[in-house]
Amino acid sequence: MIIRPGSIVSALQKLSCLAAVLGLAGIAPAIAAEPKPDAAVKMKYIDASVTLEKQIRTNAPLAENLLAEGKHWIEENRGNAAKEFKASPELFRDGRAWTFERSYAQTSNVGGRYVSIVRTDYVYTGGAHPNTLIDTILWNDETRKQISIRPFFKETADNGPTLKALRDAAIAAVKAEKKERGIEDSGDIDWYQGILPALLKVGAISLAPSTVAGKSAGLAFHYSPYAVGPYAEGSYTVFVPWETFKAHLSPQGLAIFGGDRPPDTKPDAE
């Protein structure tokens, strides 16, 4: 499960108090400092931040692109929060500002060209609990642009053979992960009806790392909480080996896939 970024005030206060106690006791705290946000806005009605993983910061064009996207996201949410604050100020009493935290993490670099990024948004605007939204970005280091996985396949038409194969493989992988977690789906809800044979609806996709240098072992599908199960189940990241969809790969796709997933790869590292 992907861990949400933690800049909640109470959590930081607890860490600060613990560090102070350890310092007074002459013990060096072994708690790693929270990464400093690359962009942040804090006002009466909003507490928002964007954080780039250290590895991303070393890639200047990529970092610039993602940071611009993140700042736009902050500004959009700031505007919405400002309107709500003006219309219903009582919702923001006692320091109850809306919280928006976005983090970008690099999960693979295939052939020194294709960089997979997982974008995680933590959002709380009141209600029973916060929401975590997960999406992915594929970056081409040569063209310095965000791209799609479409060129890796012979065709990617909605309801076409490629997307149907990917849809079926993704659902099977989620069911296998649920079985491993000891979770049984309720017969009252079809949690897989939202996974459709369309590139934008089959799931957030990233290129999984491989045991072969410069290759990808397959596709990782990332699902936010609520996407394929109740909120309590959390998020899912599942793996589909490249051999499963080999018949649908274009020459460009055949060139980047190969090998197996490293045995020590954790789901949230894909």
Residue ranges and their predicted role:
Residues 22-23:
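Repetitive helical segments and hydrophobic/amphipathic motifs
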